[in-house]
UniProtKB/Swiss-Prot annotation:
Oligomeric form and interacting partners: Part of a disulfide cross-linked outer membrane complex (COMC) composed of the major outer membrane porin (MOMP), the small cysteine-rich protein (OmcA) and the large cysteine-rich periplasmic protein (OmcB).
GO cellular component, one term: cell outer membrane
Bias kind Low complexity: ranges: 89-103
UniProt record similarity statement: Belongs to the chlamydial porin (CP) (TC 1.B.2) family.
Function: In elementary bodies (EBs, the infectious stage, which is able to survive outside the host cell) provides the structural integrity of the outer envelope through disulfide cross-links with the small cysteine-rich protein and the large cysteine-rich periplasmic protein. It has been described in publications as the Sarkosyl-insoluble COMC (Chlamydia outer membrane complex), and serves as the functional equivalent of peptidoglycan.
Gene that produces this protein: ompA
Keywords in alphabetical order: Cell outer membrane, Cell shape, Disulfide bond, Ion transport, Membrane, Porin, Signal, Transmembrane, Transmembrane beta strand, Transport
Entry protein name: Major outer membrane porin
Organism: Chlamydia muridarum
Alphabetized GO MF terms: porin activity; structural molecule activity
Record carries keyword Signal: yes
Length: 404
């Protein structure tokens, strides 16, 4: 039985090395691996011994904590319906007939899967050990992230077929009550966050030991709130990039006409509130200085940006009859002229107007995952753990620590 257990754990660790946000499982035997310190000798006393004090039972470990998530499996967490303008129909030729009536439509972001979600964390690790069996630990450090998904996941919308004209100067303009009426799903949205403070707390216990085998459990909670550093929208009809984007929180359509301009007011910095909890159960087996382990975990992560709406950057006043770089799309018709005395009422009908997107809430698409790793212990004082996680995420973890 012992040979079988050794073979399974060794094969799992070696076989996973080629298959490589974010919480590691950790070695279940970690509380009892480092039994000696660099400053104070370890003490393996009996908790029932009346001569034993808490000073003998408690020890401290410090180290480096690095967690690198290459792909977290996420999906949007939104309502089934989305309020915007009516869908253009075949009867709309030169311009859309109705662009001011708010209509509940099927939400294109509902149940969408993110194409890529990455998170990289570097932190200091501190653990308080009790009786060489229990750990209470925390991490303090910094994290940064990257998200990429189909534009439908971000509710990228705009107004096409606007036929409102300004009679005073015969130049077509967008009315204050105009609503976006088309959803752009054949595009990609990606965002990068800045490096923000991150922390986590947790506890780990060696529940059962038999010879060199250890069964343990752990629970962890992590939190961070990075700001969005850069937002890229890769769309043929409306392509733009925003550095340090700002938007509207709790604002329904229509957005203010100043949205996207330098004079926009009541906007907030776009940030993502990340929360995650995780419970895990793992089994390890010590082979001299190596202690491989395998574990399962249950976790729930959420990324909430308060559904902030971010408008496409544009000029407050037209220059050369344009406010954005959005292309003119004539289709089967002709390009309308929106200037001069002979201006037509649909001068903006061939160009996408009032483009915006929103950062929807996201959550874990899968709750269960697998973790495989190994710990190398030297002189019972120093340890380095390497771990990989699969199924609900593709991630790697490195932890190096020493005991005082």
């Amino acid at each position: 039985m012992k040979k079988l257990l050794k073979s399974v754990l060794a094969f799992a660790v070696l076989g996973s090395a080629s298959s490589l946000h974010a919480l590691p499982v950790g070695n279940p035997a970690e509380p009892s691996l480092m039994i000696d310190g660099i400053l104070w000798e370890g003490f393996g006393g009996d908790p029932c011994d009346p001569c034993t004090t808490w000073c003998d039972a408690i020890s401290l470990r410090l180290g480096y904590y690095g967690d690198f998530v290459f792909d977290r499996v996420l999906k949007t967490d939104v309502n089934k319906q989305f309020e915007m303008g009516p869908v253009p129909t075949t009867t709309d030729t030169d311009a859309a007939a109705d662009i001011t009536t708010s209509t509940p439509r099927e939400n294109p972001a509902y149940g969408k899967h993110m194409q890529d979600a990455e998170m990289f964390t570097n932190a200091a690790y501190m653990a308080l050990n009790i009786w060489d069996r229990f750990d209470v630990f925390c991490t303090l450090g910094a994290t940064s992230g990257y998200l990429k998904g189909n534009s439908a996941s971000f509710n990228l919308v705009g107004l096409f077929g606007d036929g409102v004209a300004n009679a005073a100067n015969a130049i077509a303009t967008v009315a204050a009550d105009s609503l976006p009426n088309v959803s752009l799903s054949q595009a990609v949205v990606e965002l990068y966050t800045d490096t923000a403070f991150a922390w986590s707390v947790g506890a780990r216990a060696a529940l059962w030991e038999c010879g060199c085998a250890t069964l343990g459990a752990s629970f962890q909670y992590a939190q961070s709130k990075p700001k969005v550093e850069e937002l890229n929208v890769l769309c043929n009809a409306a392509q733009f990039t925003i550095n340090k984007p700002k938007g509207y929180v709790g604002k329904e359509f229509p957005l203010a006409l100043t949205a996207g301009t330098d004079s926009a007011t009541d906007t907030k910095d776009a940030s993502i509130d990340y929360h995650e909890w995780q419970a895990s159960l793992a089994l390890s087996y010590r082979l001299n200085m190596f202690t491989p382990y395998i574990g399962v975990k249950w976790s729930r992560a959420s990324f909430d940006a308060d559904t902030i709406r971010i408008a496409q950057p544009k000029l407050a006043e037209a220059i050369l009859d344009v406010t954005t770089w959005n292309p003119t799309i004539a289709g089967a018709g002709t390009i309308a002229d929106g200037t001069g005395a002979a201006a037509t009422a649909n001068g903006l009908a061939d160009t996408l107007q009032i483009v915006s997107l929103q950062l929807n809430k996201m959550k874990s698409r899968k709750s269960c995952g697998l973790a495989i790793g190994t710990t190398i212990v030297d002189a019972d004082k120093y340890a380095v753990t390497v771990e990989t996680r699969l199924i609900d995420e593709r991630a790697a973890h490195v932890n190096a620590q020493f005991r005082f």
